[in-house]
């Protein structure tokens, strides 16, 4: 597989906030999609603290999630999306 990761700059239309959606391959069967709030130049405000992360086990699942988040962050209110994914994620121990 030639693709190692995906990266998209997103400007939210309702709030005009900027985000970066990044998907990377962490391991052979582990992909991580992270959403960062960004500044005017689309540089993440906090590199080590994304708004949320979602793990995937297959490349197809990771790419689909990346595309879905990119579209949703463009059109929907970001707080609603962030809350949805934080509630779905298991609590750290």
Regions found by a protein language model. Give the residues of each.
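Short N-terminal "domain-start" leader segments
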Residues: 1-35, 39
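Intrinsic-disorder/low-complexity coil detector
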Residues: 13, 43, 49, 58, ...
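Intrinsically disordered, low-complexity charged/polar segments
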Residues: 81-93
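Generic detector of bulky aromatic hydrophobic side chains
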Residues: 33, 55, 76-78
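Short intrinsically disordered, low-complexity segments
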Residues: 37-38, 66, 92
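Short arginine-rich
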Residues: 67-82
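A short, exposed loop/beta-hairpin motif centered on an aromatic-Gly-Thr core
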Residues: 41-64, 68-69
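Generic signature of intrinsically disordered, low-complexity, basic-rich segments
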Residues: 17-19, 29, 52, 67, ...
């Amino acid at each position: 597989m030639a693709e190692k990761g995906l990266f998209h700059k997103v400007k939210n239309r309702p709030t005009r906030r900027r985000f970066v959606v990044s998907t990377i391959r962490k391991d052979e069967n582990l992909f991580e999609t992270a959403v960062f709030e960004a500044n005017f130049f689309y540089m993440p405000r906090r590199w080590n603290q994304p708004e949320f992360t979602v793990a995937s086990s297959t490349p197809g699942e990771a790419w689909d999630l990346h595309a879905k988040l990119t579209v949703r962050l463009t059109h929907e209110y970001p707080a609603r999306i962030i809350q949805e994914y934080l509630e779905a994620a298991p609590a750290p121990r």
